[in-house]
Amino acid sequence: MDGQSEHVGGPSVREELIAIRERWHCMNHPFYDRLSEGELELRHLAYFLVQHSLLVRQIFRSIGVTYAKSPDDIAHFIVENLAEEAGLLGIDGGEAHDHRDLIFRFTRHSGWTDDDVRNAELLPTWYARAAYYWWITDAEPPIVRIAVQATQESQLVGENGARAVPALIEHYGFSENSPEIGFFTEHATADVKHGDILLDLVEKHATTPELRARALRLAEQTCKLRWVSFNELYRVTHLGEEVGQAPE
């Protein structure tokens, strides 16, 4: 099989993962529609970054377990990705940025104190996403975790490149070089590379029909959960609803 995923006719596993991502792509969510219209408050976009930062903290801790279980090429990607996230390595030789610092630039501009960000809690569906990553890491082969991640990181390209950055420039007074929106501009391009590498790894290591089917199933479940987490984010921010409250 020369290390490629086994399938007879039909789409490749790469093509199927891309189709799953596009079907559930959160750049099509009403949250980003309101942003593109200039109707979303900046503090609500900042709250997305707060939730994202808390989630990523758990994702990267759990992926350390995946690193320990992975073949060398997957392990190398994980180390490089972690180094870029922490600002120890620039993307494609560019300037290195700690992504937490990029987030703080925008949250400070939007009225959040650093303590507010650090002391925030994950919304219930975002907490469920974190727990789901830990479960996949514990229960599934490393390549299933990589397939899941392939459908998640690459969504940031569309969300930021097609929706967030143009909206922030058109409606909110920023320029493409405004340091406050550095998180959005960097992720409009950085995750193209990451997504391609992840898809290549899945093509190489999802070598049986059973492994391929499992990777696709859990990738779609993760995409659905991401969409649902944006539903909750949208409801508690733009719609101002109280969700997840204990009954009286």
Q: Model segments located where?
A:
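Active-site-proximal alpha-helical scaffolds that flank and shape metal-associated catalytic sites
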Residues: 8-15, 19, 76-183, 224, ...
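Short alpha-helical hairpin
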Residues: 14-41, 59, 166, 235, ...
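Alpha-helical bundle segments that constitute or directly flank the non-heme di-iron/ferroxidase center
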Residues: 21-26, 40-72, 144-164, 226-230
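Structural helix-adjacent loops and short alpha-helical linkers that scaffold large soluble proteins
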Residues: 67, 71, 111-117, 209-216
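C-terminal, helix-dominated tail/subdomain
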Residues: 107, 186-190, 203-228, 242-248
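Transmembrane alpha-helical segments of integral membrane proteins
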Residues: 195-203
